[in-house]
Amino acid sequence: MEAKNNRILKDKTFDKSRWIQMPRDVIAGHDALLQLPNVITDLGVTGPLLLLSGKTTLQTVGLEVLRLLEDRQVTSAVVGEITYEEIARVEDLAQNIGAVLIIAVGGGRVIDTAKVVSYNLDIQFISVPTAASHDGIASSRASIMTADGNVSVAAHPPLAIVADTGIIAGAPHRLMAAGYADMVANYTAVMDWDLSKSKTGEQVSEYAMTLSMITAELMVENAEKIKAFDENAAWIVVKALFASGVAMSIAGSSRPASGGEHKFAHMLERLVPGKVLHGEACGVGTIISMIMHEGDWKKIRNSLRLIGAPTTPKDLGISDEIVIEAILRAKEIRPERYTIFDEDITREQAECLVARLYEE
């Protein structure tokens, strides 16, 4: 018998492969920002650095970063709304100074800008979140504003994360509550992924699904602690945001943390731009999705109420009609991603879903 016929694994019996990119260093906790110089040294980075931040943050945390890195060549820049034009401007700046590393100090807008620029120029970046408002601090996806609304694009995950819980706890409580809601959304994101598996045959990652679900469960179990909005609360939420980002890296997509509730949220943000925080919209979308999945939606609703997150259109400061429209049009967002919002939902059903949000 020829040797080739003695192979234990025959040709094409297994053809799966995946390149998983995750942060190399994660520093989180009290005074974590002071470790930033050590993190950069540990990464072996030498050369010009580009510090990106928001206008206000640059004058506070940004100045502290510049002080900590005073022995390095650092250029700072304020970033605006994350648009393709703004990304191009930052890319030009990074290339002009020969940046070898980007340090993103701020919220989701700043970090997403760094992600995309990092990806396009093939240089790494460090995420230094100043708020825990959504899981973008650790993920490999970014949201870009366009004339037709936000679009999600592939990007680099951070090479390192430096999350100072003192700084994060000092942010407005509304931001941490939004981050909590974004994590609770993992419940229905996983349900939708499983639904798509049965409806369309989509491949799933059991590891990513499990990690994502555990993250959501830990949020609900710790809601009483998180509602204090202190450093311990920031510690719990930041770890969950990081775990959710890891789940997405394992999956190679945002699937384990983004289902129909996110499609609903993106449509809501398109209908009333600037009116609601992303995490807040996801929280309401999660309740609606859980009702459709016939799950324990009141458990989700009650946990969101406990930490002061919106649970109704009235809480969001928008009309019921807008939410009804967002339910009906959610399937326009990423139509290739099947979720329960892609089922045939009538206007009457959408109206009933919104009415149930006000139930006790």
Swiss-Prot record:
One Pfam family named in its UniProt record: Fe-ADH_2
GO molecular function: glycerol-1-phosphate dehydrogenase (NAD+) activity; glycerol-1-phosphate dehydrogenase (NADP+) activity; metal ion binding
Binding site for NAD(+): G108, R109, V110, I111, D112, T130, A131, A132, S133, S139
Principal subcellular localisation of the protein: cytoplasm
Pathway assignment: Membrane lipid metabolism; glycerophospholipid metabolism
Cofactor note: Binds 1 zinc ion per subunit.
E.C. no: 1.1.1.261
Residue sites binding substrate per the record: D135, D182, H266
Gene Ontology BP term (one): glycerophospholipid metabolic process
Classification via InterPro entries: G1P_dehydrogenase_arc (IPR023002), G1PDH (IPR032837), Glycerol_DH (IPR016205)
Compartments, record wording: Cytoplasm
Binding residue positions for Zn(2+): D182, H262, H278
Domain of life from the UniProt record: Archaea
CDD domains: Gro1PDH
One cellular component (GO) term of this entry: cytoplasm
PANTHER family the record matches: GLYCEROL DEHYDROGENASE (PTHR43616), GLYCEROL DEHYDROGENASE 1 (PTHR43616:SF5)
Family designation: Belongs to the glycerol-1-phosphate dehydrogenase family.
Job of this protein: Catalyzes the NAD(P)H-dependent reduction of dihydroxyacetonephosphate (DHAP or glycerone phosphate) to glycerol 1-phosphate (G1P). The G1P thus generated is used as the glycerophosphate backbone of phospholipids in the cellular membranes of Archaea.
Protein name: Glycerol-1-phosphate dehydrogenase [NAD(P)+]
Organism: Methanocorpusculum labreanum (strain ATCC 43576 / DSM 4855 / Z)
